[in-house]
């Protein structure tokens, strides 16, 4: 009789335990949404600061929520995104610690390390989504979109006021979503603002859209004029200009050398016919003959066609990066690498002694004028290579001379970063902005 009673109790307890387990719901995903829209069912662009809310069938164990159970990665460089994760019963709030990059693709992954309060593991889940806006990589410190009057910097901490805006008109930009562009007349148009040299850093990127107009862009003798597109202190800081025949384009730069004292002006000049191609030489005679071109590691070759079809009266995206850690500087046109130098390669006994110190470069910088009174200052200028009060370069470089190489055309979306962007970032930024 006792045996029967104990067996009955045992079966009852076992049955109760079995029934209890059957009532436990597995941890399944019900929905994942941003701003009330289910990402699982709708292709949507997510705002860069919007939290994502995941809802499950049963309560989540807060101790199972971690950087390995809930992950977000940026697709273009596979960078992990730091997340703020908050559990409330069956809901999980997933919020980036800092705003996501606009116009970028991300992947959200939830792994079996996530568990319910009963210890049941989640299966697995991954979903991709794209953020709103045009792709703009991190570390942007200044941006001019020319939508406001005066056309001030609208991003970052640089924030100067455009103190001189001379003969600037506005025109429709490169596409419907780009608003307006600044139009320069080729003789007097200019925008300038103070303290441009503050933007020159050991890690640096400048990117802008331009539409050069060569029609009627001639001097008083009928000769074609080149184009000073923008600048900080002419060749002594940073300036970009284009040859009148489109044989070359150039970023002149001021460079701070490794002793932290010496500052020199140097040209980063892309010859589109491949004139500097394959100039990393192995014998002493060639090294001595090629000078700065010994630093060339990549050079597109467009032959006699030059740059005309890429730059003349068409919208073109120009990007230049400088990277102290690799001693490299790179020019891109329309997201494609055109020209690259590695200045550390100048550290060679067969290279001219005058050029070897460039191998120690540490930063872009404004080379100060040693003459009194100074012939230029550190204003950032759009439409010319130096501020309009400057006297450097004589008549040919003077703003007041209508025969000088004033820029004629349109400018838009000028961006500056305190980081050297990668090839992928430059390409994505071009694709997003075109």
Give residue ranges: language-model regions:
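Acidic, low-complexity Ser/Thr/Gly/Pro-rich repeat segments typical of extracellular/periplasmic
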Residues: 22-137
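Short surface loop/edge beta-strand patches of beta-sandwich-type extracellular domains
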Residues: 135, 183-206, 302-308
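Extended recognition patches within non-cytosolic domains
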Residues: 136-138, 399-400, 410-434
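Short hydrophobic/aromatic patches on beta-strands that form ligand-binding or substrate-lining surfaces
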Residues: 142-145, 206-212, 318, 414-415
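Short, tryptophan-glycine- and acidic/Ser/Thr-enriched carbohydrate-recognition patches
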Residues: 145-172, 428-431
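Short tryptophan-centered beta-strand motifs in secreted/extracellular beta-sheet-rich domains
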Residues: 208, 313-323, 329-331
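Short, aromatic/His-centered strand-loop micro-motif at the edge of beta-sheets
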Residues: 256-317
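Flexible glycan-contacting loops in extracellular carbohydrate-active proteins
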Residues: 343-409
């Amino acid at each position: 009789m006792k045996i029967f009673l104990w067996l009955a109790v045992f079966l009852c307890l076992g049955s109760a335990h079995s029934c209890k387990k059957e009532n436990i719901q597995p941890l399944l995903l019900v929905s994942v949404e941003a701003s009330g829209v289910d990402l699982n069912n709708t292709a949507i662009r997510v705002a860069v600061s919007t939290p994502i809310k995941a809802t499950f069938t049963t309560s989540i164990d807060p101790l199972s929520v971690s950087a390995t159970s809930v992950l977000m990665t940026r697709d273009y460089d596979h960078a992990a995104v730091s997340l703020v994760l908050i559990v409330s019963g069956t809901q999980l709030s997933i919020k980036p610690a800092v705003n996501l990059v606009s116009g970028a693709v991300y992947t959200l992954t939830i792994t079996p390390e996530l568990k319910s309060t009963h210890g049941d593991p989640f299966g697995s889940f991954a979903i991709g989504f794209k953020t709103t806006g045009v792709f703009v990589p991190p570390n942007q410190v200044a941006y001019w979109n020319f939508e406001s009057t005066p056309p001030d910097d609208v991003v970052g901490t640089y924030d100067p006021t455009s103190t001189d805006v001379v003969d600037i008109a506005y025109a429709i930009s490169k596409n419907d979503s780009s608003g307006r562009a600044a139009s320069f007349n080729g003789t007097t148009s200019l925008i300038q603002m103070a303290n441009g040299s503050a933007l020159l850093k050991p890690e640096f990127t400048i990117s802008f859209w331009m539409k050069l107009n060569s029609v009627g862009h001639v001097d008083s003798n009928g000769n074609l004029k080149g184009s000073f597109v923008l600048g900080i202190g002419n060749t002594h800081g940073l300036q970009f200009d284009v040859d009148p025949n489109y044989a070359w384009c150039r970023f002149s730069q001021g460079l701070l050398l490794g002793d932290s004292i010496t500052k020199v002006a140097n040209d980063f000049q892309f010859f589109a016919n491949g004139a500097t191609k394959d100039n990393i030489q192995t014998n002493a005679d060639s090294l001595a003959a090629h000078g700065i071109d010994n630093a060339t590691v990549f050079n597109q070759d467009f032959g006699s066609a030059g740059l005309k079809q890429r730059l003349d009266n068409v919208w073109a995206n120009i990007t230049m990066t400088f990277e102290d850690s690799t001693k490299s500087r790179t020019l891109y046109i329309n997201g494609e690498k055109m020209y690259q130098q590695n200045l550390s390669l100048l550290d060679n006994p067969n290279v001219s002694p005058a050029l070897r110190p460039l191998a120690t470069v540490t930063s872009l910088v404004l080379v100060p004028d040693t003459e009194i009174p100074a012939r230029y200052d550190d204003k950032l200028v759009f439409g010319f290579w130096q501020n309009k009060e400057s006297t450097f370069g004589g008549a040919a470089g003077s703003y007041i001379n209508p025969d000088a190489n004033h820029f004629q055309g349109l400018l838009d979306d000028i961006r500056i970063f305190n980081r050297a962007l990668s090839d992928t970032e430059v390409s994505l930024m071009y694709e997003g902005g075109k």
